[in-house]
Curated annotation (Swiss-Prot):
Similarity section: Belongs to the universal ribosomal protein uL18 family.
Lineage: superkingdom: Eukaryota
Organism for this UniProt entry: Neurospora crassa (strain ATCC 24698 / 74-OR23-1A / CBS 708.71 / DSM 1257 / FGSC 987)
Gene Ontology molecular functions: 5S rRNA binding; structural constituent of ribosome
Gene Ontology biological process terms from the UniProt entry: ribosomal large subunit assembly; translation
Purpose of the protein: Component of the ribosome, a large ribonucleoprotein complex responsible for the synthesis of proteins in the cell. The small ribosomal subunit (SSU) binds messenger RNAs (mRNAs) and translates the encoded message by selecting cognate aminoacyl-transfer RNA (tRNA) molecules. The large subunit (LSU) contains the ribosomal catalytic site termed the peptidyl transferase center (PTC), which catalyzes the formation of peptide bonds, thereby polymerizing the amino acids delivered by tRNAs into a polypeptide chain.
Localization in the cell: Cytoplasm
Name of protein: Large ribosomal subunit protein uL18
One Gene Ontology cellular component: cytosolic large ribosomal subunit
Subunit structure: Component of the large ribosomal subunit (LSU). Mature N.crassa ribosomes consist of a small (40S) and a large (60S) subunit. The 40S small subunit contains 1 molecule of ribosomal RNA (18S rRNA) and at least 32 different proteins. The large 60S subunit contains 3 rRNA molecules (26S, 5.8S and 5S rRNA) and at least 42 different proteins.
UniProt cross-references to HAMAP family, sorted A to Z: Ribosomal_uL18_A
Keywords: Cytoplasm, Ribonucleoprotein, Ribosomal protein, RNA-binding, rRNA-binding
InterPro entries xrefs: Rbsml_uL18_euk, Ribosomal_uL18_C_euk
Length: 301
């Protein structure tokens, strides 16, 4: 096939069509988004909810979002830094924290809808693959709250943390259509899920194993990497109980606030805080006074 050089003439520029801004910035996969937000036309005004999972360097952000013409509407949200209220102070971006944050979001959503007693999900995490099913009520069969996983631009590798967040939300009582083949412990050859491996990840067992290995092999690095764990007297064998207690506390009160959390600052307080670091422009009189001070200092020398 012959090579055709791209000629950027006036016709090229007059017919050029720019991509969406968030595509140009590399923030949104519109191919996936189109399929996630398109609702069946026979469902009329029923919103289609997405479980949006995003990771930052120090936090995990989970939201239940529906799309409207005017923009996306957030129905509920949960952040991994909120886990401090439930006793999880460290490792707020690992697999176990992702699961706990997913569980927190699910319980919040169902509490908000008044469905927390109808759909309890998996009360004691066992690592088994299970989808939330319809529940029998006094008024007949009640279908569960349904959401679709939205991973954004994250890689969907087997064992990725996004699936930890999804598993937590699923065990919390939300119906999220998924299969078991992306969870840690899934064997591609036998096509079976090892529930014990998945359970280990849910309760931070993989972190505990690494802590023990590092403590034996390189104590100096262990003290450096797990410095805050050591300060709080948190050892490898105590992680499972810590996460189990946190899961129970989340189910008991999904809207709990951390005790150390200070009251929110007002708009005026934030403004004063920002002005503290902003260098204000000097007036003409102040500049002249400064010049005179420097002249006086030089003369005194």
């Amino acid at each position: 096939m012959a090579f055709h050089k791209l000629v950027k003439n006036s016709a090229y520029y007059s017919r050029f069509q720019t991509k969406y801004k968030r595509r140009r910035e590399g923030k949104t996969d519109y191919y996936a988004r189109k399929r996630l937000i398109t609702q069946a036309k026979n469902k009329y005004n029923a919103p289609k909810y997405r479980l949006v999972v995003r990771f930052t360097n120090r936090d995990i952000i989970l939201q239940i979002v529906s799309s409207e013409i005017t923009g996306d509407k957030v129905f509920a949200s949960a952040y991994s830094h909120e886990l401090k209220a439930y006793g999880i102070e460290h490792g707020l971006t690992n697999w176990a924290a992702a699961y706990a944050t997913g569980l927190l979001l699910a319980r919040r959503v169902l509490k908000k809808l008044g469905l927390d007693e109808t759909f309890k999900g998996v009360e004691e995490a066992d690592g088994e693959y299970k989808l939330t099913e319809a529940a029998e009520t006094d008024d007949g069969e009640r279908r569960p709250f349904k959401a679709f996983l939205d991973v954004g631009l994250a890689r969907t590798s087997t064992g990725a943390r996004v699936f930890g967040a999804m598993k937590g939300a699923s065990d919390g009582g939300i119906f999220i259509p998924h299969s078991e083949n992306r969870f840690p412990g899934y064997d591609m050859e036998s096509e079976e899920l090892d529930a014990e491996t998945l359970k280990k990840y849910i309760f931070g067992g993989h972190v505990a194993e690494y802590m023990e290995t590092l403590a034996d092999d390189d104590e100096e690095r262990y003290k450096s990497q797990f410095n805050r764990y050591i300060e709080d007297d948190l050892e490898a064998d105590g992680l499972e109980d810590l996460y189990a207690e946190a899961h129970a506390a989340i189910r008991e009160d999904p809207f709990k606030k951390a005790e150390s959390e200070a009251p929110k600052k007002t708009k005026e307080e934030w403004k004063a805080e920002s002005l503290k670091y902003k260098k204000s422009k000097l007036t003409r009189e102040q500049r002249a006074a400064g010049v005179q001070e420097r002249i006086a200092a030089l003369r005194s020398e």
